[in-house]
Amino acid sequence: MASKSLFLVALLVGSFAFTSFASVANRKLKSGLEDQKTFFHHPGGGLGGGGGIGGGSGLGGGGGFGGGGGLGGGAGGGGGLGGGAGGGAGGGFGGGAGSGGGLGGGGGAGGGFGGGAGGGSGGGFGGGAGAGGGLGGGGGAGGGGGFGGGGGSGIGGGFGGGAGAGGGFGGGHH
C-alpha cells in the first residue's frame, strides 16, 4: 500500500511539473515566434506575394525561402524552391543570378549550392547556362526549366533579401 501511495504522489508531482514546464515552454515558443515574425517580416507574406522567410514573397511570385538570396533564390527578383532569379551577383543555397532560379539553375554570376554561372534562362535542379558551378550547376545555353523558370533583374543577398519578379515551382517570366 505504501508503495502505491508513493507512486500516486510521484505521479501527481510529475504531472504538475510537466504542466508547469509545458506552459513556460509554450510562452517561450510564442514569444520566439513573435520575434521571428518581426525579424523576417516583409510586406505581404505566406505563400503569395510579399514576405515569407525571404524578401519578394512566399512560395509563389518572387520569393519563398530566399526571395533574391538565401536558400533558393539567386540575386535579383525571385527565389524560393523554384521561383525566378534575376540579374546580378547570385548566391544563396541554390539559385545563381541571371534568369534562372530554383534549387540549382541560374545564369549570370551564379554560385551557391547549385547555381550556374554565365547567361541564359536557367532553371531546374541543376540546369542553368554558361560556365556552370556549385553542386549542380550545368553548362550549355538556352532556356532551362524544371523547378526553375523566372526572370527579372537586380541584386539579392543573405538568407532572405532581394525582391522583384519571379514565380513559384516553375512560373515567372523571361
Swiss-Prot record:
Name the UniProt key words of this record, in alphabetical order: Signal, Vacuole
Q: Where is the signal peptide?
A: 1-22
KO phenotype (gene knockout): Reduced organ length (e.g. inflorescence axis and roots).
Query: Principal place where this protein is found?
Result: other
In the record, biological process GO terms are: positive regulation of cell growth; positive regulation of organ growth; response to abscisic acid; response to flooding; response to salicylic acid
Describe what upregulates or represses it: Accumulates in response to flooding stress. Induced by salicylic acid (SA) and abscisic acid (ABA). Stimulated by 16-hydroxypalmitic acid (HPA), a major component of cutin.
Summarizing the function annotation, the protein's role is: Involved in organ growth by promoting cell elongation processes.
User: Which protein are we looking at?
Assistant: Glycine-rich protein 5
Which species does the entry assign this protein to? Arabidopsis thaliana (Mouse-ear cress)
